[in-house]
Amino acid sequence: MLSFSGFSYRRQQERDRKEIKHMKNRLHVKAPGNWVNDPNGMIYYKGQYHLFYQHFPYAPRWGTMHWGHAVSRDLVHWEHLGVALFPSKDEDQNGCFSGSAVEENGVMHLFYTGVHYNQVNPKDIHQCLDQDFTSAQLHLTSKD
């Protein structure tokens, strides 16, 4: 153990770890549960910050991507609004992946990558066979 004038390096490391954990729990947005992946589409819209993120809401493992949605007025306190995007059409039936958000004339526009597996892996429905998939850039709008 390294010590300088009664100062314990190991004790300071432990204090630092606790402080980092405390700050991380306060300042890092976490989904209410299950798998969380890349943040997408951070935007300030109608008086709130909106954060979208890739999310598999059914298990704590990677799966067919959805977009979770959280809002904040101060970037510290977040309210989770649930799933914002979910696979709902042929072009994104196997996941809603990375994208962005922009505002134009009071309307929020979400752009994202939809994925469709041409051959699904029979051992894991969340994977395609032999990288055989198509992707499409998709767009939707919201006024609320």
Language-model features, listed with the residues they occupy:
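Beta-rich carbohydrate-recognition and catalytic domains
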Residues: 2-144
